[in-house]
Amino acid sequence: MKKQHDTIIVLDFGSQYNQLIARRIREFGVYSELHPHTITAEEIKAMNPKGIIFSGGPNSVYGEGALHCDEKIFELGLPIFGICYGMQLMTQHFGGKVERANHREYGKAVLKVENESKLYANLPEEQVVWMSHGDLVTGLPEGFVVDATSESCPIAGMSNEAKNLYGVQFHPEVRHSEHGNDLIKNFVFGVCGCSEGWNMENFIEVELEKIRETVGDKKVLCALSGGVDSSVVAVLIHKAIGDQLTCIFVDHGLLRKGEAEGVMKTFSEGFHMNVIKVDAKDRFMDKLKGVEDPEQKRKIIGNEFIYVFDDEASKLQGMDFLAQGTLYTDIVESGTATAQTIKSHHNVGGLPEDMQFKLIEPLNTLFKDEVRVLGSELGIPDEIVWRQPFPGPGLGIRVLGEITEEKLEIVRESDAILREEIIKAGLDREIWQYFTALPGMRSVGVMGDERTYDYTVGIRAVTSIDGMTADWARIPWDVLEKISVRIVNEVKHVNRIVYDVTSKPPATIEWE
């Protein structure tokens, strides 16, 4: 029997941070779902949530193409918390004034609490918050009071406690807001009255039921790569429908060292799944020959991947569904109906229009760290659960520019050395993701008294909670030295190593 739990609904107005809001709430043990701003009041009412959060967004509430919501949502009597654009939308709805700011405010600011509403209960009077806005609330709606101010924002927070309506001009969901979690927690528990009750055990129960209802007696193909996401998808679906699942492992020649052999051993022998291995290396390399543009590479790899599945499915009987390990972060990085696109993601951007399968994506409401917890709950070994995140296009987007066998081998061997040394140093759980990339640039060097003109290998290592934001990892110098010396000595055609010290934003984690 499905367990009941309190729910907070988040309405998406296009912020790149909107997924983080739901993520923060789940960290509190309360279920949260993201829905498009076009959802109706009746649909929300049917979900019986305890409260609603309006996300931020890049638009102006008074501008052309401004995003709005069903005005009846304000009549549901539910607590509403507007963040940035969400606060401005609330202001506009209730007759307040929103104007263009003299200067766009982006970055850290000091917030001063002027009125201790429930939102600011037990929080410091001054705190650092993260601002990202071009508009300001300059006139309060009737019945609202100013909760907080900042140097550049006279109305940085407002509330109408009689109606349980709250708004902030900053982003509490971003970790740069030092008490942001506590503020959201105050809304979820203090204002909405939620109770903890959602966890991975609940998620598994709900998803197993959903998979069985969706699939019925039909069959599912799973795109198994051996990475964390596809592994968890495969085990979850196998747990739900058993032998109705067939896993197809496509070796596209863009995998890490030893990965192909490891996948077959773990899933075919260890989990007793039906796994079909397809050697498609030549097919992929032919399609990628001469292609340098990263977006084109992603599309080609995504398309070819599905076509391989089509070919294999035609040999099987009655395959209706294709399972993918799409995550929340995959979707936000590819752009939703409202979010501005950062890059086409390998799981959601490269699908051909004539695809013959219906997609089943049981992880598309989870973040990477949640997927690891789910994997452990499902009994998947740590060496798989804590495996490095690996993109669908594989090493294809870690070789910048045209892909060749020589370049792939350089990345494959250097990446294996990096992983080996990071594990030896005991840093594999501290660093969220680490890999090598080949930027395609050559430089002059000296090896054995001879001049060389060889490739540079870039090392990328980041710390993160959920992949939405990331900081470059402070790997100890002695460990970096070992990695550098080994790669230059053991990998052919490499004479220089560089370390990427850029956070996300402004950079993405992958180089392409």
Curated annotation (Swiss-Prot):
<dbReference type="GO" id="GO:0003921">
    <property type="term" value="F:GMP synthase activity"/>
</dbReference>
<keyword id="KW-0547">Nucleotide-binding</keyword>
<comment type="subunit">
    <text>Homodimer.</text>
</comment>
<dbReference type="Pfam" id="PF00958">
    <property type="entry name" value="GMP_synt_C"/>
</dbReference>
<dbReference type="Pfam" id="PF00117">
    <property type="entry name" value="GATase"/>
</dbReference>
<dbReference type="GO" id="GO:0005829">
    <property type="term" value="C:cytosol"/>
</dbReference>
<feature type="active site">
    <location>
        <position position="171"/>
    </location>
</feature>
<feature type="binding site">
    <location>
        <begin position="225"/>
        <end position="231"/>
    </location>
    <ligand>
        <name>ATP</name>
    </ligand>
</feature>
<dbReference type="InterPro" id="IPR029062">
    <property type="entry name" value="Class_I_gatase-like"/>
</dbReference>
<feature type="domain" description="GMPS ATP-PPase">
    <location>
        <begin position="198"/>
        <end position="387"/>
    </location>
</feature>
<dbReference type="InterPro" id="IPR001674">
    <property type="entry name" value="GMP_synth_C"/>
</dbReference>
<dbReference type="InterPro" id="IPR014729">
    <property type="entry name" value="Rossmann-like_a/b/a_fold"/>
</dbReference>
<keyword id="KW-0658">Purine biosynthesis</keyword>
<comment type="pathway">
    <text>Purine metabolism; GMP biosynthesis; GMP from XMP (L-Gln route): step 1/1.</text>
</comment>
<dbReference type="InterPro" id="IPR004739">
    <property type="entry name" value="GMP_synth_GATase"/>
</dbReference>
<keyword id="KW-0315">Glutamine amidotransferase</keyword>
<feature type="active site" description="Nucleophile">
    <location>
        <position position="84"/>
    </location>
</feature>
<feature type="active site">
    <location>
        <position position="173"/>
    </location>
</feature>
<dbReference type="InterPro" id="IPR025777">
    <property type="entry name" value="GMPS_ATP_PPase_dom"/>
</dbReference>
<protein>
    <recommendedName>
        <fullName>GMP synthase [glutamine-hydrolyzing]</fullName>
        <ecNumber>6.3.5.2</ecNumber>
    </recommendedName>
</protein>
<feature type="domain" description="Glutamine amidotransferase type-1">
    <location>
        <begin position="7"/>
        <end position="197"/>
    </location>
</feature>
<keyword id="KW-0067">ATP-binding</keyword>
<dbReference type="InterPro" id="IPR022310">
    <property type="entry name" value="NAD/GMP_synthase"/>
</dbReference>
<dbReference type="InterPro" id="IPR017926">
    <property type="entry name" value="GATASE"/>
</dbReference>
<keyword id="KW-0436">Ligase</keyword>
<dbReference type="GO" id="GO:0005524">
    <property type="term" value="F:ATP binding"/>
</dbReference>
<dbReference type="Pfam" id="PF02540">
    <property type="entry name" value="NAD_synthase"/>
</dbReference>
<comment type="function">
    <text>Catalyzes the synthesis of GMP from XMP.</text>
</comment>
<dbReference type="InterPro" id="IPR022955">
    <property type="entry name" value="GMP_synthase"/>
</dbReference>
<keyword id="KW-0332">GMP biosynthesis</keyword>
